[in-house]
Amino acid sequence: MVGKALGLEFNKKIINTLKGEQMNPDFIKINPQHSIPTLVDNGFTIWESRAILVYLVEKYGKDDALYPKDIQKQAVINQRLYFDMALMYPTLANYYYKAFTTGQFGSEEDYKKVQETFDFLNTFLEGQDYVAGDQYTVADIAILANVSNFDVVGFDISKYPNVARWYDHVKKITPGWEENWAGALDVKKRIEEKQNAAK
């Protein structure tokens, strides 16, 4: 979605981690951590989606709207990006993505961590329109991607009114939302297939 916001086109190569394609020696040469996404930009390689987002807006942004130069604004954006990486994505993986391999969602304790994560996000959004303050930034885009995955697998976002308000707004203004949602629907389909096979 950041690429769309910046008007960039990518030469995408799909790596199927469920089939272990990330362990291909050619991919490991590019990224020894064998994680996705990975960006190769004119010979420069970087991975971890939030690091990629910041790199792209710093290099290709026409202005600093998505990642302001103001150090305090950057600090809040970075905190939200780290929150997304350290809490939001792991709770998604631990509760919902377990179904990719087992056909079963995670434990009740895992679900409580999902709720706690959304409580934090709801608090961040109290009295403001965007996750890192008064303007739309890369933090909104990163967190939108994860919130959409929670949404598609049935997590009740409406219990978190600030998150629900933000989500309804940000998905309307984010370039590439439709492609992101299509990916989220694919996640849902794969989880449902695994759940049906486990019955």
From Swiss-Prot:
Domain GST C-terminal residues, every copy: 70-199
So which residues are the signal peptide here?
A: none
Where is each GST N-terminal domain found? 1-64
Q: What does this protein do?
A: Has no glutathione S-transferase activity.
Name its species. Drosophila melanogaster (Fruit fly)
Entry's Pfam families?
Answer: GST_C_2, GST_N
List the taxonomic lineage: Eukaryota, Metazoa, Ecdysozoa, Arthropoda, Hexapoda
For this entry, the protein name equals: Inactive glutathione S-transferase D3
User: Hey, which family's this protein in?
Assistant: Belongs to the GST superfamily. Delta family.
Q: List the disulfide bonds.
A: none
A single GO cellular-component term from the record reads: cytoplasm
Q: Where does glutathione bind?
A: 34-36, 48-50
InterPro entries in the cross-refs: Glutathione-S-Trfase_C-like, Glutathione-S-Trfase_C_sf, Glutathione_S-Trfase, Glutathione_S-Trfase_N, Thioredoxin-like_sf
What SUPFAM superfamilies is this protein classified in? GST C-terminal domain-like, Thioredoxin-like
Q: Report any one BP term from Gene Ontology.
A: glutathione metabolic process
Highest taxon of source: Eukaryota
This protein's assembly is summarised as: Homodimer.
